[in-house]
Amino acid sequence: MQEKSIRLGIVVAEFNYDITQLMLQKALSHARFLNVEVKVVIKVPGTFDMPLAIKKLLEKDFIDAVVTLGAVIKGETKHDELVASQTARKIVDLSTEFNKPVTLGIIGHGATHEQAVERIEEYATRAVEAAIKLVQRTRKLDELKEIKETVIIE
C-alpha cells in the first residue's frame, strides 16, 4: 500500500526578515528534498501574529500539518519572553484543538541576532522533519484498532 502524501502549510514571521526569509528558503528546500508538498506559505507581521494564520490553515482539509518559522530576538526588556511564551502556548492549544501537528520552528526567546543566524538551518529543517514524523506517526496511531501487546510507533 502506498503511503498517503503529506501536505504542509508554513506560517513565517516577517519580523527579523533577514533571518526568517532564510528559514523559509531552508524549510522549502528541505520539504522538497523529503518529497513533501508545501501547499501554502503565509507570511504574518510577527511571531505573535501567527495563531490566527495557523488556525485558518488547520481548518483546511488539504493541510496535514503546519510548520511555524520565526525569530524572537532578545531586547532590552522582557518583551521577547512574553511573545515567545504566549505564541508557543497558543500553538500547542491549536494543535490539540484541531488534532493536527503544529511544529515550533521559532528561534528564541533570549537569542541574540548572531545566535539566531547560527540556528537558521537547524530550526527550519527540524520543524519540517517534526511535522512529517508527527503526521506519519499519528496516521499509524489512527489505524490502530484493538491491540493485545505494546505497540511502538516510529
UniProtKB/Swiss-Prot annotation:
(2S)-2-hydroxy-3-oxobutyl phosphate binds at E76, T77, R119. NCBIfam families: lumazine-synth. CDD domains: Lumazine_synthase_archaeal (cd09211). It comes from Saccharolobus solfataricus (strain ATCC 35092 / DSM 1617 / JCM 11322 / P2) (Sulfolobus solfataricus). Belongs to the DMRL synthase family. Its EC number is 2.5.1.78. GO terms for biological process: riboflavin biosynthetic process. This is 6,7-dimethyl-8-ribityllumazine synthase. Signal peptide: none annotated. Catalyzes the formation of 6,7-dimethyl-8-ribityllumazine by condensation of 5-amino-6-(D-ribitylamino)uracil with 3,4-dihydroxy-2-butanone 4-phosphate. This is the penultimate step in the biosynthesis of riboflavin. SUPFAM superfamilies: Lumazine synthase. 5-amino-6-(D-ribitylamino)uracil binds at F15, T47, F48, D49, A71, V72, I73, L104. One of its GO terms (molecular function) is 6,7-dimethyl-8-ribityllumazine synthase activity. It catalyses: (2S)-2-hydroxy-3-oxobutyl phosphate + 5-amino-6-(D-ribitylamino)uracil = 6,7-dimethyl-8-(1-D-ribityl)lumazine + phosphate + 2 H2O + H(+). One of its GO terms (cellular component) is riboflavin synthase complex. Keywords: Riboflavin biosynthesis, Transferase. Pathway: Cofactor biosynthesis; riboflavin biosynthesis; riboflavin from 2-hydroxy-3-oxobutyl phosphate and 5-amino-6-(D-ribitylamino)uracil: step 1/2. The active site is at H79 (proton donor).
